[in-house]
Amino acid sequence: MPNKGFMRAFSTSNAFIKFVLRAGALYLILYLIYQFVVKRYTLYDQGFIGWIIESTDVVLRTMGYKTFKVLQDRDMQVIGIDGSNGVWVGSNCNAITLFSLFGVFIIAYPGNQRDKWWYLPSGILAIHVLNILRVVALAMIANSYPQYLDFNHSYTFNFLIYMFIFGLWILWVNKFADKHIQKDEQN
C-alpha cells in the first residue's frame, strides 16, 4: 500500500501539482498553436522578426553605427553593422516562446486577476525590450569580436534572458501572488 504522504504529495489537490499540471497544459496548448497555426498560416512570426530588426536598426543608428538589413528568406532576416557579417534573426530569436513561458507561469500561478492584467503585458514588454537589446549587443559583438558571437549567443544571453524571466517570476510570487494567497488564507 502506498505511503499516504506520498499520495497526498502527488494528488491533484496539492497546489504545486495543480500549478504544474495547469502550466504544462497551457504551455503545450500555446506551443501547438504557435507551431502549427501561427507559424504556418500567418505572417505574425515574420512581422515580429521584422519589428525586432527595425528596432535593433533604430538603436544601432542612434548609437552612431551604420547598419545594413537583409531579408534572407521568409523566416530569417539579417541585421548588422557595416563591415560585419551581421546576425541572423529568425523565429527562434523573436522571444515569442519566452513570452509564452513567462505568461504561462503568471496565468497558472494563483494571484489577483487584476494584477495579472497589468503584470503580464508589462513583463512581456520588458522581455521584448531586453530581447532587442540582446540583438543589438550581438550585432556589436559580430562587428568588434566575431570570434565571441557564438558563445555569447548560445550561453551568455540565454542565461541573462532566462534569469530576467526568473526574476520577473520571483517578483510576481513575492509581491503579488503571495499577497493574494495570504488574503485567501486569512478569510
Label the predicted regions:
Residues 1-187:
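Hydrophobic N-terminal alpha-helices or hydrophobic patches in metabolic proteins across all domains
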